[in-house]
Amino acid sequence: MLSGCGTDMKKILTADGGKWEVDEGSSKSTYTFFDDGKFSVYDSKDNAAGKYSYDEKNKKITFDVSGRGTFIMEKVEYKDGKINGEINDRETVFVKEK
C-alpha cells in the first residue's frame, strides 16, 4: 500500500492547478495542493506551507504545517465540486477555485 494521500482524493485535490478556497467568515484562505504531498495556504494576513495526507479508511486529511503543528479535517466528503469536512468540530468547505 502506498503512503500519503489516497489516489482519488489526491487527484481531486491537485487537479487543475490544485487551488481551493476556504471561506472562514472574516477571511478567505487559498490552499494549493501539489502532487508531492505538499501544500501552501495564504490569506490576507499570513501564509504557510507543509505536507498533507489523506486517510481513506477514516475519511481524514491531515495537514502538517511547517513549524506550527498539525490539524485534521475529519468526515471528508467530495461532492458537487466541494470538499466538506470538520476541523475542530467546525464545518469547513473547500471550494475549487476557478
Each language-model region and where it sits:
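Contiguous, well-ordered beta-strand patches that form the walls/edges
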Residues: 23-34, 40-93
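Short, solvent-exposed mixed-charge patches
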Residues: 97-98
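Short, charged low-complexity linear motifs
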Residues: 5-8, 36-40
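N-terminal helix-cap/turn-to-beta initiation motif at the start of protein domains
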Residues: 5-21
